[in-house]
């Protein structure tokens, strides 16, 4: 089917027919600028009978011939077969291997559209075969939405981490402190979950099931005084100040202040009417004596001016006084009642004196009843307290008795343990004393025995001396010759024994010298480093009692006699290779980089090698002197020269110096052993 929009149809009508057969479908270059929502593409479908059926939208315009290309009519018309050959694009042949759905629209260039004049009516020849279609454009890259995914994953990860932190905070106190301190709203979340868990576990905990219902307190109707009462603005203002019975004043106390108000209080300022008794008015009030009926009347006297009062004196009602200082509820009730009396006294005391007196009696009865109830409660409480004290005393006595019994048992147990321990210690000390006495007795007996033996020897010596003297006196000539003979024989025996020791020492010295020569021969005749553990073990066995030889052998490094030491020729050959590498790094500083290495390598090629015995501390002079010492066989001086190097030169010659040190240590130890052997020979002589 062929579907096209109005914009595409108008562009086809305004453009000439392309003379070439390569463009199968015509498309304006401006079609890309149209809205993508109204763009439609070709879709060709071949019916079984081979006829091509075109279906146009109701808003599309059909073209019947070439002369009607410039019309802008929007009427729809079904084209006939001849019109299809003129205006419709060439349909693909039935033998084509390409499917119509896979063929894309090829845009028409503006230059090719303008080549044919608008008035040209020559029909385009139908191509014999359809050209191969152009390759499809690459599909647009799909939107990855990395930022959206990143934000989504970040939000989910943060939420999971936060929920995990809240959950773990309910199980770990240390993590709870960390989480509530650093996590935002962490403490509120944890507290909310704890409260919710508590409500789930104890649903009736917040209900007031165990509390006693308190009856509402009947305070009566609230008494108010009109604000506009009085004759002048000044008195009305004072009345407004005194109308608030909740402020501090004489009416707030039902005991102390009412005792002082037994005398009659008259109104000081009659122009403003009757006001409540405030502390400022107490100073200006004039006190009068009480009347016998309980109602106190006194004509008012103005303190400020000496003129007569404009209003006649009024009577007042005495306040209620109850001796219940330690009952706050009764005090509050009396205070409220006295406030009412104050208000009534200010308005019409004579009309309410009867009910007020009756109320006073009722309140006094209530006060007495409260005092009686209080005394009964105090008596019952005191009784309970006494009973509790008695039970506590009894329990304390039982506890003290139990503690005394336990203490006595512990004391008996400790005493038995103490006696057993004391007996054990006494027995052990007795055994020690017996042992010491026995040893002292044995020592004394041995001392006495030794003294007896010494005395016997001394007596025997004296006896022999006496006998000798007697015999010499008798036989002076023969005995004297015998004594000389005995002394000569003893001297010969002594010399014989001494020479046997000398022979043994010489034999050991010779064996030691032979073992040292064997070690030296092994080291000098080996071309490669060779271990000399057996030779060194023989030397150590021959001089096992000599501390100097043992110290010399211990000074040799285990690596030296386990792996062997290089020969002098090997050291010289290795020195030459090491000297070449040291000369390459002779110009490098300690913290050299790649540039310094390259510069040192280049400059080393142009440097001249020194000969003889040059003076100086540079690397080349040191290497020359060390090489001369090696040629002379002086390893010690060569090692000293190489040890004076610094930086990279010393680092490169570190292994060679270690080998030279091991060789010097072995040679020095062998020299010490040989010297010790010679000293032995000299001591014998």
Swiss-Prot record:
Topological domain ranges for the Mitochondrial intermembrane compartment: 170-685
InterPro entries attached to this UniProt entry: MIC60
Q: Name one Pfam family in it.
A: Mitofilin
The transit peptide spans 1-19
Any one cellular-component term (Gene Ontology): MICOS complex
Q: Which residues form a coiled coil?
A: 356-456
For this protein, the parts annotated as crossing the membrane are 150-169
Task: Map out region (Disordered) in residue numbers.
Answer: 49-144, 209-305
Q: Which keywords fit this entry according to its UniProt record? A: Coiled coil, Membrane, Mitochondrion, Mitochondrion inner membrane, Transit peptide, Transmembrane, Transmembrane helix
Question: From start to end residue, where is composition biased (Low complexity)?
Answer: 51-67
What are the subcellular locations of this protein?
Mitochondrion inner membrane
Comp. bias regions, Basic and acidic residues: 259-271
Q: Which residues lie on this side of the membrane: Mitochondrial matrix?
A: 20-149
Q: Where is the composition biased (Polar residues)?
A: 68-99
Q: How does it sit in the membrane?
A: Single-pass membrane protein
Q: Give the family from UniProt.
A: Belongs to the MICOS complex subunit Mic60 family.
What does the record give as the function of this protein?
Answer: Component of the MICOS complex, a large protein complex of the mitochondrial inner membrane that plays crucial roles in the maintenance of crista junctions, inner membrane architecture, and formation of contact sites to the outer membrane. Plays a role in keeping cristae membranes connected to the inner boundary membrane. Also promotes protein import via the mitochondrial intermembrane space assembly (MIA) pathway.
For this entry, the protein name equals: MICOS complex subunit MIC60
Native source species: Paracoccidioides brasiliensis (strain Pb03)
Q: Which gene encodes it?
A: MIC60
């Amino acid at each position: 089917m062929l579907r096209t929009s109005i914009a595409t149809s108008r562009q086809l009508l305004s453009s000439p027919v392309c003379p070439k057969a390569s463009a199968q479908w015509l498309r304006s270059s401006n079609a890309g600028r149209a809205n993508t929502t109204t763009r439609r593409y070709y879709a060709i479908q071949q019916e079984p009978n081979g006829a091509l059926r075109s279906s146009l939208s109701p808003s599309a315009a059909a073209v019947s011939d070439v002369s009607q290309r410039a019309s802008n009519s929007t009427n729809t018309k079904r084209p006939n077969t001849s019109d299809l050959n003129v205006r419709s694009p060439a349909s693909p042949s039935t033998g084509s291997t390409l499917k119509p759905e896979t063929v894309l629209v090829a845009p028409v260039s503006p230059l090719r559209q303008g080549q044919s004049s608008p008035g040209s009516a020559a029909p385009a020849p139908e191509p014999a075969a359809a050209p191969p279609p152009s390759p499809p454009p690459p599909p647009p890259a799909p939107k990855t939405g990395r930022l959206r995914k990143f934000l989504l994953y970040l939000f989910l990860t943060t939420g999971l981490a936060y929920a995990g932190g809240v959950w773990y905070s309910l199980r770990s106190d240390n993590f709870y402190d960390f989480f509530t301190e650093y996590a935002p709203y962490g403490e509120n979340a944890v507290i909310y979950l704890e409260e919710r868990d508590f409500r789930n576990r104890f649903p009736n905990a917040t209900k007031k099931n165990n509390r006693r219902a308190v009856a509402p307190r009947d305070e009566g109707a609230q008494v108010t005084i009109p604000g506009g009462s009085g004759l002048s603005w000044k008195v009305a203002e004072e009345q407004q100040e005194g109308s608030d019975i909740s402020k501090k004043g004489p009416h707030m106390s039902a005991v102390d202040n009412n005792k002082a108000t037994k005398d009659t209080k008259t109104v000081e300022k009659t122009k403003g009417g009757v006001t409540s008794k405030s502390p400022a008015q107490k100073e200006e009030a004039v006190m009068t004596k009480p009347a016998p009926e309980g109602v106190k009347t006194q004509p008012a006297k103005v303190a400020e001016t000496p003129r007569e009062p404009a209003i006649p004196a009024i009577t007042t009602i005495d306040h209620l006084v109850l001796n219940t200082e330690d009952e706050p509820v009764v005090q509050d009730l009396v205070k409220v009642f006295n406030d009412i009396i104050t208000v009534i006294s200010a308005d019409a005391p004579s009309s309410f004196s009867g009910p007020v007196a009756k109320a006073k009696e009722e309140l006094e009865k209530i006060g007495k009843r409260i005092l009686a109830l209080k005394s009964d409660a105090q008596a019952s409480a005191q009784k309970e307290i006494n009973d509790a004290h008695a039970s506590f005393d009894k329990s304390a006595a039982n506890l003290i008795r139990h503690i005394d019994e336990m203490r006595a048992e512990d004391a008996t147990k400790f005493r038995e343990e103490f006696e057993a321990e004391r007996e054990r210690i006494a027995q052990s000390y007795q055994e020690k004393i017996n042992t010491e006495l026995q040893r002292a007795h044995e020592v004394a007996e041995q001392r006495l025995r030794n003294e007896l033996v010494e005395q016997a020897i001394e007596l025997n010596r004296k006896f022999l001396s006496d006998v000798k003297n007697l015999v010499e006196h008798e036989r002076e000539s023969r005995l004297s010759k015998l004594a000389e003979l005995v002394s000569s024989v003893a001297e010969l025996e002594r010399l014989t024994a001494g020479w046997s020791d000398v022979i043994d020492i010489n034999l050991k010295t010779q064996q030691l010298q032979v073992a040292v020569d064997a070690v030296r021969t092994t080291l000098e005749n080996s071309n490669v480093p060779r271990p000399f553990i057996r030779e060194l073990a023989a030397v150590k066995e021959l001089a096992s009692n000599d501390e100097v030889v043992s110290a010399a052998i211990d000074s040799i490094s285990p690596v030296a006699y386990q792996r062997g030491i290089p020969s002098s020729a090997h050291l010289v050959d290795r020195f030459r290779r090491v000297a070449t590498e040291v000369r390459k790094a002779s110009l490098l500083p300690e913290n050299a980089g790649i540039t310094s290495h390259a510069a040192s390598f280049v400059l080393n090629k142009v440097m001249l090698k020194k000969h003889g015995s040059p003076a100086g501390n540079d690397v080349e002079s040191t290497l020359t002197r060390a090489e001369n010492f090696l040629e002379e066989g002086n390893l010690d001086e060569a090692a000293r020269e190489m040890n004076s190097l610094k930086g990279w030169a010393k680092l490169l010659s570190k292994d060679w110096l270690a080998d030279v040190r091991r060789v010097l240590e072995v040679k020095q130890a062998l020299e010490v052993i040989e010297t010790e052997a010679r000293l032995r020979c000299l001591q014998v002589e």
